[in-house]
Design a protein with these regions (language model features):
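Conserved ABC transporter NBD signature motif
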Residues: 86-94, 103
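Conserved ABC ATPase signature
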Residues: 159-163
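ABC ATPase nucleotide-binding domains
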Residues: 1-28, 256-299
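Helix-to-loop junction immediately C-terminal to a conserved catalytic motif
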Residues: 78
Length: 299
């Protein structure tokens, strides 16, 4: 059984989660500390001697409350922030030794605000440009394929900044895939969307699994986490306090209650009926409790 882990606030720094063994390591945090001074001059620590590995093929969700370190971790990986101490490796090479061009070929980030991904005056131009700067072969053909896959073909000549929320989000994801990185980071991909658009983007993210290698998502959307993630990393007070599957995370009440995770409503409803139930979707809920409720058709 994969080891579960919960760390109280005072846990010694050398004790850390032991994630399940996976494929080759493509990114590693080695004793990484990040700290800064507030506007009042007070010291603030985000991470203290953080150790963590991301493996090839991982589909990871980073979860935790605001200020837990999710965005900081992503910014460290793409070189937007530098650690106060420790090192970050990509494919066994320190990012300190990588030129920006070499770093961007290995890892790319799709920002929470999709508009930040648009440079050209058309979606087709943005996708093509992303591949041109990465020197991806057959970029014209690949652009058409991505426009088709992300249901953007009819919007090819539209300015991304003028699209609807869902269209804009799909376009930003297509650009992220076009960058062809070994590791793709997605910051809050379902934030600020209505219910229908959110479901559409969740389907898009699921489809992307077939054409992306390693993906890390930072999110507060627990339904997305439960339906999409194959590995969940829980951040709390600047520490990785849990690392495992959805059953290991949401089925561990210590983690859920002490870290303040809010499971999907359908999961909570299932637990209220049966504490051993682990239902993450409506279909799973109905299947789990089929026949346990009276038929009220004649009542």
């Amino acid at each position: 059984k994969e080891k579960q882990y919960f760390a109280p606030k005072g846990l010694p720094a050398e004790e850390k989660p032991l994630p399940p063994p996976k494929g080759e390591t493509v990114a590693a945090f080695q004793n990484v500390s990040v700290s800064y001074r507030s506007v009042k001059g007070e010291p603030h620590t985000v991470f203290s001697r953080l150790n963590l590995e991301i493996h090839k093929g991982d589909k990871v969700a980073l979860i935790g409350s605001n200020g837990a370190g999710k965005s900081t971790m992503m910014k460290l990986l793409v070189g937007l922030l530098k650690p106060s101490s420790g090192d970050i490796l990509l494919n066994e090479k320190s990012i300190r030794d990588l030129k920006p061009e070499a770093l961007s070929r290995q890892i790319s980030m799709v920002y929470q605000n999709p508009e930040d991904m648009f440079i050209k005056d058309s979606i087709g131009g943005d996708i093509a440009y992303a591949m041109e700067v990465r020197r991806v072969p057959d970029s014209a053909k690949r652009t058409d394929e991505l426009l088709e896959r992300f249901r953007l073909k009819e919007l090819k000549n539209r300015d991304g900044r003028l699209l609807s929320g869902g269209q804009m989000r799909r376009a930003s994801l297509a650009i992220g895939v076009a960058l062809n990185p070994g590791i793709l980071l997605l910051d809050e991909p379902t934030a600020n969307l209505d219910i229908a658009t959110r479901k559409e983007i969740m389907r898009t993210l699921e489809d992307m699994k077939a054409i992306t290698e390693t993906v890390v998502i930072a999110t507060h959307d627990m339904q997305l986490v439960c339906e999409w993630a194959e590995r969940i990393i829980v951040l709390w007070n600047g520490r990785v306090v849990a690392d495992g599957s959805r059953n290991e995370i949401f089925g561990n009440r210590d983690i859920v209650e002490k870290v303040g995770i809010r499971p999907p409503e359908i999961f909570s409803l299932g637990q209220a009926i049966d504490p051993d139930a682990l239902c993450y979707t409506i279909d799973a809920f109905l299947n789990s409790f089929e026949g346990r409720f009276p038929n009220n058709e004649n009542s």
